[in-house]
Amino acid sequence: MAGLRYRHGMSAAAILFALLLAVPAPAGAGDGPAPGKAWTFSFYFENDLFSGTDRNYTNGVKLSWVSPDLSSYRESGGLPEWAVPWVRKLPFINTPGLQRNVALSLGQSMYTPEDTDRDTLIRNDRPYAGWTYGGIAFHSKNESRLDTIEIQAGIVGPHSYAEETQRLVHELRDIDVPAGWDHQLEDEPGLMLIYERKNRVLDKRRPGGLGVDAITHLGAALGNVSTYANAGFEVRTGWNLPADF
């Protein structure tokens, strides 16, 4: 068993390395934006431990690198030259005069049924599943609007290594490991196309002072991992609110 886990670990590292190679890396200062314009790194972590449950969408981790504001996607230095004409043909994100950003990401999402103590197949509940992916997103924005198109590619199934991730987290926290991962979805390559529009419908931000704004969002995703439409609304308040979304 120890040897099997070791081989799995090596495969996971190989897959992660392949995803990193597949997604263009942020360019150096000489190839992309002017010096002083750095890429921004973000780490997202979602887990239902905060609500005391362990079911359905139970864990999500995402690492993202976002370029500085650009006048064109080519300026990022992270796109191969052959890809630039294709990006220019994408809808919604090529409106003249708007700022651009390129975002690169690596992530993993994990799903389990409500009853995680059973080691037999549960036919009337969400199956065990993991989705590990790399993504590239293109943003087009001004002060009041943000359009995003994202492409994600990865794998669902045992080689997503969601089981190993959950086992590690549960062992570190000294809690029971879900028993039914032997019945997770089989390996299948995944591809997702995601679009989202955000609009700032209220803007009472004050530089150096207390402000408030309100943002609506509307989006959809199409792919063999999930297909959905979404809509939402958020209100932000705080000191010196940034001009982001």
Residue ranges of predicted features:
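Short regulatory "switch" loops immediately downstream of catalytic or recognition motifs
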Residues: M1, P68-Y73, R200-L202, G238
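Outer-membrane pore/translocation modules
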Residues: W86-F245
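N-terminal secretory signal peptides that target proteins for export/translocation
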Residues: M1-H8
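Transmembrane beta-strand segments that form the barrel wall of outer-membrane beta-barrel proteins
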Residues: T40-L49, E75, L210-L222
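Bacterial N-terminal signal peptides
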Residues: S11-V23
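Short glycine/proline- and aromatic-enriched beta-strand/turn motifs that initiate or cap beta-hairpins
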Residues: A29-Y73, N101-T116
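Outer-membrane beta-barrel biogenesis signature
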Residues: A27-K37, R74-G97
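Short acidic, Gly/Pro-enriched loop/turn segments at secondary-structure junctions
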Residues: S72-S76, S144-L146
